[in-house]
């Protein structure tokens, strides 16, 4: 998917990018490739692949109608090189985006990236989701939490749901069907008062299958969750 294909496909979906937005995606690509030589950000560095498998894939929840251009508080867990939240922010500038990542070098990259792209209302924090999930400044504060290929739902639910307001939504982007994952996550979702409200499949323009699972938070998360860093992965609920 060339940049021109990317712009045209978005226009067909009703999103006509401004010259500023096009420049932001171009700068994003160039900085991603440049910084990838210093720290491991992605295995995908060819321009057409970045536009398809990072940029287009990241904004799929918007294209599929699951997010609006409103000043909602969005948290991205384990965003790595900023996916999916920063492409979403470029497309929908009204979003207020927070990223938590466990690697400080990635936070350095994201901070520089946001400055170069001229993004406002973006916040970056270094640390573990399990620790921030017990912090009152973060717990129960977000309308949406996004996670792209971070962990299976049994683990992901404990890392994300505590951050949501009641009625807030987890938007999980997956490359594989989530049916088996959701079956394994039933107990975790029950304990965390999360309910699957959508399990959506779609295709990238090249025909690759992708999946979006949306979980809504129904009640306050019990205070014992999330457990200490590492435990959700070692001993899933």
Swiss-Prot record:
Pfam families: GidB. Its main location: cytoplasm. GO terms for cellular component: cytosol. Transmembrane segments: none annotated. GO terms for molecular function: rRNA (guanine-N7-)-methyltransferase activity. The keyword S-adenosyl-L-methionine applies. Gene3D superfamilies: Vaccinia Virus protein VP39. It is found in: Cytoplasm. InterPro entries: rRNA_ssu_MeTfrase_G, SAM-dependent_MTases_sf. S-adenosyl-L-methionine binds at residues 78, 83, 129-130, 148. Keywords: Cytoplasm, Methyltransferase, rRNA processing, S-adenosyl-L-methionine, Transferase. Its EC number is 2.1.1.-. Specifically methylates the N7 position of a guanine in 16S rRNA. PANTHER family: S-ADENOSYL-L-METHIONINE-DEPENDENT METHYLTRANSFERASES SUPERFAMILY PROTEIN. Belongs to the methyltransferase superfamily. RNA methyltransferase RsmG family. This is Ribosomal RNA small subunit methyltransferase G. It comes from Streptococcus pyogenes serotype M49 (strain NZ131). The gene is rsmG.
């Amino acid at each position: 998917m060339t940049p021109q294909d990317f712009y045209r496909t978005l226009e067909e979906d009703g999103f006509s990018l401004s010259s500023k937005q096009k420049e932001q995606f171009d700068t994003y690509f160039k900085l991603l490739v440049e910084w990838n030589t210093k720290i491991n950000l992605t295995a995908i560095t060819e321009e057409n692949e970045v536009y398809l498998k990072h940029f287009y894939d990241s904004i799929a929840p918007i294209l599929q109608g699951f997010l609006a251009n409103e000043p909602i508080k969005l948290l991205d867990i384990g965003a790595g090189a900023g996916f999916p939240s920063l492409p979403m922010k470029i497309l929908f500038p009204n979003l207020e985006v927070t990223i938590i990542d466990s690697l400080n070098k990635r936070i350095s990259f994201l901070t520089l990236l946001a400055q170069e792209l001229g993004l406002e209302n973006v916040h970056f924090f270094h640390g573990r989701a399990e620790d921030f999930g017990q912090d009152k400044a973060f717990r129960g504060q977000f309308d949406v939490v996004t996670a792209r290929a971070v962990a299976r739902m049994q683990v992901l639910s404990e890392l994300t749901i505590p951050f949501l307001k009641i009625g807030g939504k987890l938007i999980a982007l997956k490359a594989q069907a989530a049916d088996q994952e959701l079956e394994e996550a039933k107990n975790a979702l029950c304990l965390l008062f999360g309910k699957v409200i959508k399990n959506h499949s779609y295709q990238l323009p090249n025909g690759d299958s992708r999946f979006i699972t949306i979980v809504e938070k129904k009640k306050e998360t019990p205070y014992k969750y999330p457990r200490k860093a590492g435990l959700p992965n070692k001993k899933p609920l």
